[in-house]
């Protein structure tokens, strides 16, 4: 089975961007070339694409400093080309008590000190271990991996634990912008597109790494300072396309067993998030080599376009599928793939330099709505000798990423996913250096074997 180059042509595929739309076009061309029937389905998108961002601080002595910015906060808000300028107020943890304390400084008739301010707040990251995965696993392969995971750093900004600083609170107190200080090394903080699914908040925000944050606070220690924060963005109402591709099985549609939905998403920041598209194309190419008589089920490949945006900005796959019963009526189960072939990188829980760990990333093979599929997935993980893998339980009405949507519709679902520290990172070269091509191939072969076994299951599988 061949696998196309998992490259990052065109840069990050932010939702609705030219690079993203070009990627969807590429996938369509490949799938049509394999003989699949391909359809496109536009859905609404409140598009938000950052254009320019910068931070300049003028200290108490009147000296202007350009402060390096690690990243912008997606859909936080936007400024005009000149940005917004205001006094800098350091709120430390940024909790309600900090806001109240700052507001109290303006009591007695003085103007509220936060009105028109650029607030500075901490953006901590929970220091977790990979045992957060094994704690939710039916089984771990090999069993010795449980002990490894218990010692392995799993501090991940994409988990959103604790939640990102509250922009609405800052705005309600009169702030005009926010500067977040992340507890991450410069190399890891750079380009982190987080939180990746927040609603538009109307308050522009930028994020600094721990070193730039320390330098900023050193400037503030000299006395009152002012900041000019720039975050311009292209914000518009538009559409973006779901992509469906069908590979039919044998016999008339009414006589075939239910279809297998094979899904991923097309938007993402790098060659890992999302490389499910090339993997699904490899599966489509492989199964299209064989006559329809060898397939007892249709394969329906779905590429959703809106993983990296807020629920209110688009129509997510569960709602979209619910609105298309002509599609879901024929689907009996689902297989979802995301973030394959990933290598481990971390900064030792914030205590050291950002570097390769020498390990592969833990793999979650999550299963929902079917004991039959759980048994099948567990057996195939063993048979394929997939390592550092957990057979995961559903969690918080979800199935670890894109698999959540089929799961919420009650469809028996298997979802394969990893979650490296660089998952949401926009980086030079698209983080291709953190992708192991041989491992990517092994993961894709595992999916092909698993999909073949799912196709061979009798109709109306027990749940």
Where do the PLM segments sit?
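Stable alpha-helical elements in mature extracytoplasmic
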Residues: 1-6, 19-30, 162-166, 171, ...
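Structural recognition of the beta-strand scaffold that forms the well-ordered cores
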Residues: 2, 40, 118-122, 176-181, ...
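Acidic/histidine-rich catalytic neighborhood of metal-dependent amide-processing enzymes
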Residues: 268-368
């Amino acid at each position: 089975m061949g696998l196309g180059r998992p490259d990052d042509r065109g840069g990050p595929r932010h939702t609705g961007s030219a690079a993203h739309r070009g990627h969807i076009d590429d996938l369509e061309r490949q799938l049509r070339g394999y003989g699949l029937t391909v359809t496109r389905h536009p859905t609404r998108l409140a598009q938000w694409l950052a254009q320019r961002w910068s931070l300049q601080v003028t200290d108490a002595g009147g000296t202007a400093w350009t402060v390096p910015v690690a990243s912008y906060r997606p859909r936080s808000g936007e400024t005009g080309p000149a940005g917004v300028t205001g006094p800098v107020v350091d709120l430390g943890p940024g909790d309600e008590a900090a806001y109240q304390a700052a507001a109290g400084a303006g009591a007695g008739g003085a103007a509220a000190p936060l009105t028109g301010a650029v607030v500075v707040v901490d953006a901590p990251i929970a220091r977790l271990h990979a045992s957060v995965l094994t704690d939710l696993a039916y089984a771990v392969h090999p069993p010795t991996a449980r002990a490894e995971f218990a010692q392995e750093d799993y501090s991940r900004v994409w988990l959103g634990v604790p939640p990102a600083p509250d922009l609405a609170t800052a705005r309600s107190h009169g702030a005009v912008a926010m500067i977040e200080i992340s507890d991450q090394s410069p190399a890891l903080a750079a380009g982190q597109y987080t939180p990746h699914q927040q609603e538009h908040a109307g308050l522009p925000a930028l994020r600094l790494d721990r070193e730039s944050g320390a330098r900023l606070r050193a400037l503030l220690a000299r006395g009152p300072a002012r900041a000019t924060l720039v975050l311009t963005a292209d914000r518009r109402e538009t559409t973006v396309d779901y992509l469906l591709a069908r590979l039919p099985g044998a016999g008339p549609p009414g006589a075939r067993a239910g279809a297998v939905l094979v899904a991923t998403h097309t938007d993402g920041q790098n060659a890992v998030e999302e490389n499910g598209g090339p993997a699904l194309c490899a599966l489509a190419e492989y199964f299209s080599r064989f006559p329809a008589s060898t397939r007892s089920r249709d394969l329906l490949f779905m590429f959703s376009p809106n993983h990296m945006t807020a629920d209110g900005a688009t129509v997510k796959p569960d709602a979209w599928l619910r609105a298309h019963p002509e599609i879901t009526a024929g689907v009996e189960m689902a297989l979802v793939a995301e973030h394959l072939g990933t290598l481990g990188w971390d900064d030792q829980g914030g205590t050291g330099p950002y570097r390769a760990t020498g390990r592969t990333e833990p793999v979650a093979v999550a299963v929902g709505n079917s004991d039959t599929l759980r048994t099948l997935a567990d057996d195939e993980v063993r048979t394929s000798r997939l390592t550092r893998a957990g057979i995961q339980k559903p969690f918080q009405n979800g199935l670890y990423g894109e698999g959540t949507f089929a799961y919420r519709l009650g469809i028996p679902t298997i979802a394969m996913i990893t979650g490296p520290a660089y998952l949401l990172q926009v980086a030079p070269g698209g983080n291709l250096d953190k992708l192991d091509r041989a491992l990517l191939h092994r993961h894709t072969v595992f999916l092909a074997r698993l999909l073949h076994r799912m196709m061979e299951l009798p109709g109306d599988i027990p749940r």
